[in-house]
């Protein structure tokens, strides 16, 4: 039996980064259930400090997720952590767009707030390493 996988990215602004990556990938931010969140606060299972408002909606402060229109792709969860990123990622995402679209996509992502870090190639393969707005590295290939 296959096991599902969720990708979790530590960050300082989970809702902002979820919005950014949803735009990058053409995915959607997973909606949060405001009524459920209010009920959890009302019953004492959570506190107001566990919540925040993002784009006019009550959401959990600790995280936000994005999902693909393709249900077979993994969910990506952006999780609030207190410390900033300090070293190179041990795991990173590769955004595959193909050689014919790579330069346009890099330009689009830089326009959305990514930072170009370097370009590389190995044999016939070429990619551009970028950083998202919080400094997490990813590649466009």
Regions found by a protein language model. Give the residues of each.
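Conserved loop-to-helix junction within protein kinase catalytic domains, corresponding to the end
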Residues: 36-37
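Vicinal oxygen chelate
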Residues: 2-9, 23-25, 31-32, 41-46, ...
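Hydrophobic ligand-binding cavity/cleft-lining segments
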Residues: 12-23
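Short, conserved charged micro-motifs
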Residues: 16-17, 100-106
């Amino acid at each position: 039996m296959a096991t599902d996988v969720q990708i979790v990215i530590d960050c300082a602004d989970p809702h902002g980064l979820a919005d950014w990556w949803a735009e990058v990938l053409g995915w959607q931010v997973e909606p949060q259930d405001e009524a459920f969140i209010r009920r959890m606060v009302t019953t004492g299972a959570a506190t107001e400090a566990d919540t925040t408002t993002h784009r006019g909606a009550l959401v959990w402060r600790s995280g936000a997720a994005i999902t693909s229109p393709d249900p077979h792709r993994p969910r990506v969860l952006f999780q609030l952590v207190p410390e900033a990123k300090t070293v190179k990622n041990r795991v990173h995402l590769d955004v595959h767009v193909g050689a014919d679209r790579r330069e346009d996509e890099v330009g689009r992502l830089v326009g959305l707030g990514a930072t170009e870090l370097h370009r590389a190639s190995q044999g016939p393969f070429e990619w551009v390493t970028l950083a998202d707005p919080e400094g997490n590295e990813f590649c466009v290939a």
